[in-house]
């Protein structure tokens, strides 16, 4: 007899991927609980939905639980994992639970080293505007929905497919997007780029024969795997051979304007697009969404409206507005999750296009010692060539042990030797808000970048300066 699963407990509930799955299951009627090491806005929001949350991991948190879901950050010696094993409660990896969710709808999976979250969000937004009411699970907060997941009534589920731990190989989509393939999370693949490429091929081969692969052929590695595909392919990019192609691309403030040519199958009329995102990399992300829309016959007007009204994703080129600088002027703070050299370069280039002639101040917290080691020279090259001033924090370890010559000070020294910028090393991330306030000048664009605790910095800068403004005003009124 099939065991009825009613209560599902998530270990690491505060993570973007975990919280989204939990919320969808909660809306499906399951009893959901979960724990995380520290409290967060995500936990508080889920608690507000009626999900039982715990701060800290303890065996006592598992009460009448039928299944446990773990993220890759949760180790086998976690007390809740040990308690579940002792009680013979199934312990399920996050990706397997996501795969179970996808079985009930037609899955659209977005994979790639860079741009997954934004592309997933754009696809979900286009489908929603087209009246398809998709379910979605995204690795970031979709601003228009106020959440990173939603249970829709339509036939489709749009998910972000994670290659970092090879867990995307558990998914069985009917449509898959690959934005690019780059060297990251190489420890998962035995530091062999061939293994990484093969994983993407295997991921695409998991689709049924009637599935569609939507591939960015601007990416050289994606082009290399095209001959290995047996399913139908739609290519997209800026290159002349792409079936869904952008031409006449131009930056207009913090937006991108372009014309989309659509030649996958029957040639469709050119589509003029106003994308409410900055950067050429986001034009590619939008083309992926347009390619999906063509496959699903989403009306052109809905595609145009979804892209022009797109309000972004949390921690992706997220503006905190203009703030008072010490010299009497104003500066702008923008946060971005980018933490790989390719992402840093794309985001800073987007900032150049959106704010021409402005000084770019990069406040950067490297993420993981292993990535800092593997991409060290690329970080030096990208930061030196794209930023006008640099505030550099120590590496966010993400559970890793420090690696000699792959720390923040070593990166600062290398940038100094390169000679294009004079970095300021900020020993503690807690001191970064003050360092930003001290460095910012009138007209500056301060880019806070990284996947770690630097995400808390912009709000602290805003709070500091608002407090100072209140004190000044009170002094003037006294």
From Swiss-Prot:
GO terms for cellular component: cytoplasm. ATP binds at residues 112-118. Its EC number is 6.3.2.8. GO terms for molecular function: ATP binding; UDP-N-acetylmuramate-L-alanine ligase activity. The keyword Nucleotide-binding applies. The keyword Lipid metabolism does not apply. Pathway: Cell wall biogenesis; peptidoglycan biosynthesis. It catalyses: UDP-N-acetyl-alpha-D-muramate + L-alanine + ATP = UDP-N-acetyl-alpha-D-muramoyl-L-alanine + ADP + phosphate + H(+). Belongs to the MurCDEF family. Cell wall formation. This is UDP-N-acetylmuramate--L-alanine ligase. It comes from Polaromonas naphthalenivorans (strain CJ2).
């Amino acid at each position: 007899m099939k065991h009825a699963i009613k209560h599902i407990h998530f270990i690491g509930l505060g993570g973007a991927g975990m919280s989204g799955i939990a919320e969808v299951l909660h809306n499906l009627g399951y009893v959901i609980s979960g724990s995380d090491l520290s409290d967060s806005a995500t936990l508080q929001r889920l608690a507000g939905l009626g999900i039982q949350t715990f701060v800290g991991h303890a065996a006592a948190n598992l009460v009448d639980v039928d299944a446990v879901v773990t993220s890759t950050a949760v180790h086998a010696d976690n007390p809740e994992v040990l308690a579940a094993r002792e009680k013979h409660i199934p312990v399920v990896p996050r990706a397997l639970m996501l795969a179970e969710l996808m079985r009930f709808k037609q899955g659209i999976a977005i994979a790639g080293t860079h741009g997954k979250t934004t592309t997933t969000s754009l696809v979900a937004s286009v489908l929603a505007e087209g009246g398809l009411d998709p379910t979605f699970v995204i690795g970031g907060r979709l601003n228009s929905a106020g959440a990173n997941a939603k249970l829709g009534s339509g036939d489709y589920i749009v998910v972000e497919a994670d290659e970092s731990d090879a867990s995307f190989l558990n998914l069985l989509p009917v449509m898959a997007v690959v934005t690019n393939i780059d060297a990251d999370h190489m420890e998962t693949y035995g530091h062999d780029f061939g293994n990484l490429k093969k994983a993407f091929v295997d991921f695409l081969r998991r689709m049924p024969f009637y599935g569609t692969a939507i591939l960015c052929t601007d990416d050289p590695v994606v082009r290399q795997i095209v001959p290995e595909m047996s399913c139908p392919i739609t290519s997209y990019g800026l290159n002349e051979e792409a079936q869904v192609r952008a031409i006449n691309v131009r930056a207009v403030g913090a937006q991108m304007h372009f014309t989309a040519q659509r030649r996958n199958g029957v040639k469709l009329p050119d589509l003029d697009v106003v994308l409410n995102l900055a950067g050429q990399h986001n034009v590619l992300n939008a083309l992926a969404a347009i390619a999906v829309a063509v496959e699903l016959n989403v009306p052109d007007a809905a595609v145009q409206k979804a892209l022009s009204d797109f309000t972004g994703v949390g921690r992706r080129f997220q503006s905190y507005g203009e703030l008072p600088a010490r010299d009497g002027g104003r500066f702008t703070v923008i946060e971005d999750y980018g933490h790989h050299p390719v992402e840093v370069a794309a985001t800073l280039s987007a900032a150049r296009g959106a704010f021409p002639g402005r000084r770019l101040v990069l406040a950067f917290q490297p993420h993981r010692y292993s990535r800092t080691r593997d991409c060290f020279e690329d970080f030096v090259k990208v930061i030196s060539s794209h930023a006008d001033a640099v505030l550099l924090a120590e590496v966010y370890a993400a559970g890793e042990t420090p690696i000699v010559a792959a720390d923040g000070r070593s990166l600062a020294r290398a940038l100094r030797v390169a000679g294009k910028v004079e970095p300021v090393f900020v020993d503690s991330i807690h001191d970064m808000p003050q360092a930003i306030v001290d460095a910012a000048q009138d007209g500056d664009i301060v880019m806070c970048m990284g996947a770690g605790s630097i995400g808390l910095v912009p709000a602290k800068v805003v709070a500091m300066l608002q407090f100072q403004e209140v004190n000044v005003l009170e002094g003037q009124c006294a």
